[in-house]
Amino acid sequence: MFSSKENSLGAKRAPFSSNTTSSQRVAAQAAKRASSGAFAQLTSSQIQELKEAFALLDKDGDGNIGREDVKTMLTSLNQDASEDSINHMFESINPPINLAAFLTAMGSMLCRISPRNDLLEAFSTFDDTQSGKIPISTMRDALSSMGDRMDPQEVESILRSYTSHGVFYYEKFVDAIAGSKDSN
């Protein structure tokens, strides 16, 4: 029906010798899945943005980008463009990079960005004294008038557990939803 090196869809299988044990095959397949796991966690909008970035970096249109291209891109995205960061990216892939390898590498990098730090930074804009506390009136106003506005019942249910003496303890709130600073 089809050769032993093709699956039912006609795709080539990984070449294994007759001496390869089933545990070696499972380990090889697991390693392949793990490397694409970061890519699988990207949202469709992130994938689209990264495809556009890849196209911008691929100046000659050959479907590949090199180390300098990656450094330029990271710098333009305000990401870590140090030699260590770039070397880390290239530990598992060798330049030049095709689109699939680029998406996997960038997915891995984006997964390391801490949502905890992003949340703390957002809340700190309302914290004039950088004390980890925001006046409850400020939080009520922000949650009911900015972005995706919340109704008063939603605001109170969010603030209730993290409010004491008229202040919202946003660091405790962030710890609850994004993990404590000790877990990062």
Curated annotation (Swiss-Prot):
Stretch list, region Disordered: 1-29
A biological process term (GO) from this entry:
mitotic cytokinesis
Locate the Phosphoserine modifications and list their residues.
36
Localization per record? Cytoplasm
| Domain (EF-hand) ranges | 45-80, 114-149
Q: Please give the PROSITE patterns that the UniProt record associates with this protein.
A: EF_HAND_1, EF_HAND_2
- Per the record's keyword annotation, is Ribosomal protein included, yes or no? no
Q: Which UniProt keywords apply?
A: Calcium, Cytoplasm, Metal-binding, Motor protein, Myosin, Phosphoprotein, Repeat
Task: Spell out the Pfam families in the cross-references.
Answer: EF-hand_7
Q: Name one GO cellular component term.
A: mitotic actomyosin contractile ring
Q: Gene3D superfamilies annotated for this entry?
A: EF-hand (1.10.238.10)
Q: Which GO terms describe its molecular function?
A: calcium ion binding; cytoskeletal motor regulator activity; myosin binding; myosin heavy chain binding
Question: Quick check: keyword Metal-binding in the entry?
Answer: yes
Main location (coarse class): cytoplasm
Query: What else is noted?
Result: This chain binds calcium.
Its protein name is Myosin regulatory light chain 1
Task: Give the classification, highest ranks.
Answer: Eukaryota, Fungi, Dikarya, Ascomycota, Taphrinomycotina
